[in-house]
Regions:
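Sequence-level motif detector for i,i+2 pairs with an aromatic at +2
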Residues: 42-44, 122, 168-170
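TerminUS-proximal long segments
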Residues: 135-203
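A short, N-terminal "cap"/entry segment at the start of jelly-roll beta-barrel domains
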Residues: 15-106
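Electropositive nucleic-acid-contacting surfaces
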Residues: 6
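Short, small-residue-biased leader/transition segments that mark boundaries at the very start
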Residues: 1-3
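Glycine- and acidic-residue-biased ligand/ion/polar-headgroup-sensing regions
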Residues: 89-101, 112-143, 147-149
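Short, flexible active-site loops
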Residues: 109
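Non-catalytic accessory regions outside enzyme or core folds
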Residues: 10-13
Length: 203
C-alpha cells in the first residue's frame, strides 16, 4: 500500500511529526480567567466554568504541535540560503528552525552566514539552546530583533572561527515578518542596550 503525503520525501519533516493533543477532562473549578489579545492590548474575561468544557469538535481547525527537535536539517557543500530552514509559512511571515546539523563540507567553505540586510522583512530570532557559532552577546533564552534594512551578520572574529568547524550545536527559531513590527513597552523594559555594541571589534 502506498501512502502519499502532501510533503515530498526531501521535506525537512513529515506529517508523522505533527502531534495532536490527548484529551484531558477540563478543570471544573471556577471562576476561570481568559485573557484575549486585542490590537491595542489585552482583555480579561471571567467564566463560571472552564471554557474547554465541551462535548466534541466540529470544523476545519484543530490544535496540533510540531517539536523543533523533529526538524531534519538540509545541508550542502556550501552555505545554504535561509529557505532551507523554513518550516512554516503564513500570510505576512515565515518561520525557520535552526537545529544541530553538519556544517558546509566543501574544502573551502565558510560555514558562518554572510552579512546581509533583509530589505523587506523584520527578523526575530529566539535562541533556545546550544552554542550559537555566528553570534556573541546572546545566550539561551535571548531574543534578537533586526529591523528591515538593518545590515547584520556574524560579529568580528566569528566568521574566522567558523572555518574548519564540522557541525553546529544550536537550536533557534526565527520569524521573518513582511510587515513592520511595533515595539511594546514590555520590550523596551527588557531591551539589552549592550547587544548592538557586540559588533564592535574588541581588539
Amino acid at each position: 500500500m502506498c501512502i502519499r503525503d502532501r510533503l515530498l520525501e526531501h521535506s525537512p519533516f513529515s506529517e508523522r511529526d505533527i502531534k495532536t493533543p490527548q484529551y484531558e477532562n477540563p478543570v471544573s473549578d471556577g471562576p476561570i480567567e481568559v485573557v484575549v489579545r486585542l490590537a491595542q492590548g489585552l482583555q480579561s474575561y471571567e467564566y463560571r466554568h472552564h471554557p474547554f468544557d465541551i462535548e466534541g469538535w466540529d470544523g476545519c481547525y484543530f490544535p496540533w504541535a510540531f517539536n523543533v527537535n523533529d526538524f531534519m536539517p538540509i545541508t550542502g557543500k556550501v552555505h545554504q540560503p535561509p529557505p532551507v530552514h523554513q518550516v512554516f509559512q503564513a500570510p505576512g511571515l515565515v518561520i525557520c528552525n535552526f537545529v544541530p546539523r553538519i556544517f558546509d563540507y566543501h574544502p573551502e567553505a565558510v560555514p558562518a552566514p554572510y552579512a546581509h540586510s533583509n530589505v523587506d522583512s523584520d527578523e526575530i530570532l529566539y535562541y533556545v539552546s546550544g552554542d550559537f557559532m555566528s553570534r556573541k552577546g546572546v545566550e539561551e533564552g535571548s531574543i534578537t530583533f533586526h529591523p528591515s534594512g538593518l545590515p547584520h551578520g556574524p560579529q568580528p572574529g566569528k566568521t574566522e572561527e567558523s572555518i574548519g568547524a564540522k557541525e553546529a550545536n544550536e537550536i533557534a527559531v526565527m520569524i521573518d515578518t513582511f510587515r513592520p513590527l511595533q515595539m511594546t513597552t514590555y520590550c523596551s523594559d527588557i531591551d539589552d542596550s549592550k547587544y548592538p555594541l557586540s559588533w564592535l571589534d574588541s581588539e
